[in-house]
Amino acid sequence: MQLALAAKYIGAGISTIGLIGAGIGIGIVFAALINGVSRNPSLKDTLFSYSILGMALSEATGLFCLMISFMLLFAV
């Protein structure tokens, strides 16, 4: 019983590694936004809307990883 509980906690911890990728992805998206606005300030509104879309897609991946982690902890 203790081995199954330990495996559940280890699996939940490993499944949160995807959150690191989401954080890096969001950082890259907004770094590209800053770079694009500094090169062409007239496209600020367009670039901002694209960066929000990119941030949402990157954050969705992280939320899926977090959901799997919670499912491993509380549903299995």
UniProtKB/Swiss-Prot annotation:
The record marks E59 as: Reversibly protonated during proton transport. It is found in: Mitochondrion membrane. One of its GO terms (cellular component) is proton-transporting ATP synthase complex. Keywords: CF(0), Hydrogen ion transport, Ion transport, Lipid-binding, Membrane, Mitochondrion, Transmembrane, Transmembrane helix, Transport. The chain crosses the membrane at residues 14-34, 56-76. One of its GO terms (biological process) is proton motive force-driven ATP synthesis. One of its GO terms (molecular function) is proton-transporting ATP synthase activity, rotational mechanism. InterPro entries: ATP_synth_F0_csu, ATP_synth_F0_csu_DDCD_BS, ATP_synth_F0_csu_sf, ATPase_proteolipid_c-like_dom, F/V-ATP_Csub_sf. Pfam families: ATP-synt_C. It comes from the Eukaryota. It is a multi-pass membrane protein. Its main location: mitochondrion. Belongs to the ATPase C chain family. Mitochondrial membrane ATP synthase (F(1)F(0) ATP synthase or Complex V) produces ATP from ADP in the presence of a proton gradient across the membrane which is generated by electron transport complexes of the respiratory chain. F-type ATPases consist of two structural domains, F(1) - containing the extramembraneous catalytic core and F(0) - containing the membrane proton channel, linked together by a central stalk and a peripheral stalk. During catalysis, ATP synthesis in the catalytic domain of F(1) is coupled via a rotary mechanism of the central stalk subunits to proton translocation. F-type ATPases have 2 components, CF(1) - the catalytic core - and CF(0) - the membrane proton channel. CF(1) has five subunits: alpha(3), beta(3), gamma(1), delta(1), epsilon(1). CF(0) has three main subunits: a, b and c. HAMAP family: ATP_synth_c_bact. This is ATP synthase subunit 9, mitochondrial.
